[in-house]
């Protein structure tokens, strides 16, 4: 969902994943991204409300990030808890997005996104 981010810089989109990132949530995530039609320059995937992520979530995230990168979209991750971040590291997703594109909170990610979208 993108609620609460009315004043996003041009070219920046925030997608908040809410709840466990597993099989059911993955379909919604993919559908929502497909529905945007125009690619943002920067997509912030906000993981603050994700208590855990399973293998399906990890695989989907990896595929989505790869697809977005091919389309020239910079992907930033924000707010993942230690457990989720550990899984993202082990799955190679942190390396895929780049350590410099992982942020503790959405405010820091938005600052970086504003610069990256220019």
Predicted feature residues:
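Structured cytosolic domains appended to multi-pass membrane proteins
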Residues: 1-118
């Amino acid at each position: 969902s993108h609620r609460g981010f009315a004043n996003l810089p041009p070219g920046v989109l925030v997608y908040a994943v809410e709840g466990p990132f597993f099989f059911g949530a993955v379909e919604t995530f993919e559908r929502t991204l497909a529905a945007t039609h125009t690619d943002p320059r920067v997509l912030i995937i906000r993981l603050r409300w994700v208590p855990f992520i399973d293998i399906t979530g990890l695989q989907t995230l990896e595929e989505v990030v790869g697809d977005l990168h091919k389309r020239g979209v910079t992907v930033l991750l924000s707010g993942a808890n230690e457990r989720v971040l550990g899984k993202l590291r082990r799955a190679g997703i942190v390396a895929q997005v780049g350590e410099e594109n992982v942020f503790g909170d959405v405010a820091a990610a938005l600052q970086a996104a504003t610069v990256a979208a220019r």
